[in-house]
Swiss-Prot record:
Its EC number is 3.5.4.19. Homodimer. This is Phosphoribosyl-AMP cyclohydrolase. Mg(2+) binds at D89, D91, D93. The lineage of its organism: Archaea, Thermoproteota, Thermoprotei, Thermoproteales, Thermoproteaceae. One of its GO terms (cellular component) is cytoplasm. It comes from the Archaea. Binds 1 Mg(2+) ion per subunit. The gene is hisI.
Amino acid sequence: MEARPLATPEEAWRIASSLRYRHIEGTVVAVVQDVETKEVLMVGHMDPIAVVLTLTTGLAHYYSTTRKRIWLKGETSGHYQIVKEFRSDCDGDAVVIKVVQIGAACHTGSRSCFESKYSLIKALKLSLRHG
């Protein structure tokens, strides 16, 4: 599957400029969802440049708050995210990106960063144990 731009550079900058970068290090929160299954794959951060690169290349880019730089998802692993849809919330401080995930989305090698189930019962048992 081939990535295609979702916007021209001018449109991408207009979209990026309309967002409110009020989270960690001047970013918006990016919730990434599988376009077919609707499964939440991961949550990342995007600064204006990551938004523009994502929209103009059709490949998901994020701002790494630990490495302090833009990164292309899959640049080292080959597990790219081909962007099919990009939406912002009503406040403009979060986006949902619907993607075709190539390989694993999580750095642990799992398809999703949300594969571990933590139930209320487990939480209660832990609470009772540690009292």
